[in-house]
Amino acid sequence: MTLKDFKIILALLISALGFAQHNVSGTVTFSKTNTPVADVKVYDKTSGVLATTDNSGFFKFETSKKELTLVFFSFEYAVEEVTIETENASTLNITLKDLTQNLSEVEITARKQRIFELKRLNDVEGTAIYAGKKTEVVLVEQSMANLASNNARQIYSQVAGLNIYQNDDAGLQLNIGGRGLDPNRTANFNTRQNGYDISADVLGYPESYYTPASEGLSEIQVIRGAASLQYGTQFGGLINFKMKEPNPNKPLEVISRFTLGSYGLYTNFTSVSGTKNKWSYYSYFNYKKGDGFRPNSEFESKNVFAHLGYKFNEKTKLTGEITYMRYLAQQAGGLTDAMFNEDPYQSNRARNWFQVDWLLYNLKLDHKFSDKTNFTFNFFGLNASRDALGFRTNRVSQVDSNEERDLIKGDFKNFGFESRLLTKYKVFNKDATFLIGSKFYKADNYQEQGPASDGIGPNFDFTNDEYPNYGSQSQFDLPNLNVSVFGENIFYVSDKFSVTPGFRFEYIKTQSEGFYKNINTDAAGNVILNETIEDNQNFERSFILLGLGLSYKPNTNFEAYGNVSQNYRSVTFSDINIDNPAFLISPDITDEEGFTTDLGIRGNFNNMVSYDLGVFGLFYKKRIGFVTIVDTDGSIKNERGNIGDAVMYGVESLFDFNLKKIFNLNNNVKLNYFINTSVINSEYTNSEKAGVKGNKVEFVPDLNLKMGLNGGYKNLLANIQYSYLGSQFTDATNSIEASESGVVGEIPEYDILDVSLSYSYKNFKLETGINNVLDNAYFTRRATGYPGPGIIPSSPRNWYTTLQIKF
């Protein structure tokens, strides 16, 4: 081929691939006064923000699309929507109408829903790429949930396939999994608040002891396994709690919420918010206390959050946040199957306590280099502790001997920073978006286990001198270093079809430096050996994860998407360093790896039905779990280690029917029916453990169903929700009933009915509801450690009433 031939072919190829760019500009004015309106967001209904009007109401942007549905949004005006042909829209004149001030609660809800449809995770949000990914967003205020107690069953009712531990009647900890992932403290998700990490240690101890107050959240963003490239390697993906933002129209707004409920529940949530010139702020205090629905389960919690922002100019903003949470909870202990069947709410542990002290801090810089290039820098840190105290034995039914208690203390000190640069550019005259980012994370953690007092109260001091021969004693320093570089690029093959490849490079160094005691006794209980064994370990690895996403959007109401991304989960400190009488740890335990796939369609049909229907596959290598083994002394025990290879696959769907639109009801009425279904199958495809291959995977109910009816008339709103979860196993050997430990065995199927009601009048709002209306006795969790071990029952029928006052 000659150079001339090559040039001709290249020119033809570029010509075939390219398409014209169109310049769109215009002015936005107020209909009554014809004056320009500044700070109006101009949205493409399918891809997000295109421009913002300046002080003269002017906006402009460039697009390759031939047709656009534009939405113009400002907090102080009614939303305006227009469809344009871009070839003939070089200059637009848009007028915004005044927003009616006395909106009913139904009208406010409809407006928030419309705004949400504009803001929901588009292809690009800030310095993040979501194109081609399975994404879900929870509008917390519209969930009609029991927010005072963070009722996850209600809050996440329209997120497909989530498996939730429901044993905490105050919502102090969030325990959610899904697709066969252990829900324990949400450890299989990367959990963030406003984009930064909040767990104890992202890799070494990814458990979330802190959960933001739901009353302070605007939305919860859930991105499935494809989030492994941008946010962290976990199989579950990302859960990002997005806090409420400062009120942009007032210098001061105060909201106070008072809640009373069953079993001595009392909570108060008070927030202050406002904007003055270049400064903005949002802060809240949340207090909770209660007796719990079981004996020996009282709790008290205090949580403070503060956000302060300073806007230097239209291109640069600096924000700082600080979060502090402290709570003390008495733990009633676990049950065996026989104990649960006898009395599901009994307790034989009066000396077990749990204490958390959590301090988070964050500093974020947002800078816009140009209309096409954005940069963010996030600095974050954690200074926290977690203390677990109590009488533990592998025989859950054993009466407390009132001897010394077991104490596990964990101190977590870490910091990190994450920087992101996102830019929009052209490839062969076609739109493209490139994201590059890096993250540095360093943790210095400490963990100690040993004897504590033989008293009753929450005394979190060790008593090693008094009980030198206590069996479970250890001390470990646990430093951890993680450096990662990640990138994704959206290539718009056409104005309807995009391809998004991505990568993540990870360097992980986890260390364990310390000792444990080896203590042996004779048949009479006399100590014959008390030795200290040094145990120093160093795990260092580096790897690259790859992923690919596809998206097809023929119009504003339909999208087909697909994604495949690799995942990785490193062994945690609790996997290797904690002595637990309920199970053994395999000495050969190692990291998990695999990949996640998603394929689905989502959209809206004539504003009557919104839907998200998809299939998924989750493929594991060296999955960690429990298996029943025969120990060297001939006893039957549970061992935690790498079980083998596994696959989970299924269908997830969410349909939301707008009955108001279907039956042509007036604007004073709101009526929606939703059905959220997940049908999953699973199998261990390979295992060296006897009797495991071909078994079902743990935490995989065959059917996960939630349905509900949301309605309202003017200022009155109501909700009724039904939830059903099929039976599931908790160990790889698929045990049906556990031994005296209660740790492994089946979690039976259960169903729950919840109702809630709210009424608004001027600055007041009254909310009330009943959870578990039918008073079903059920459990969702077999705890391997605290708050058990054993079966942890879920709450019986309970009520709550909340009064909200807004100033």
What positions do the PLM features span?
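Short acidic/polar hinge/loop motifs at secondary-structure boundaries
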Residues: 60-62, 196-224, 582
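A beta-strand signature from Gram-negative outer-membrane beta-barrel systems
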Residues: 92-94, 211-255, 658, 806
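Extracytoplasmic beta-strand/coil segments of soluble accessory domains associated
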Residues: 126-129, 136-200
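Transmembrane beta-barrel wall of Gram-negative outer-membrane proteins
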Residues: 260-289, 294-330, 353-371, 440, ...
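Structural signature of Gram-negative outer-membrane beta-barrels, strongest in the C-terminal barrel
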Residues: 313, 431-433, 439-441, 476-619, ...
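Face-selective signature of the C-terminal outer-membrane beta-barrel domain
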Residues: 314-325, 356-395, 399-519, 551-553, ...
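Membrane-embedded beta-barrel scaffold of Gram-negative outer-membrane proteins
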Residues: 364-368, 374-390, 553, 559-565, ...
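Gram-negative outer-membrane beta-barrel transporters
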Residues: 421, 428, 495, 610-621, ...
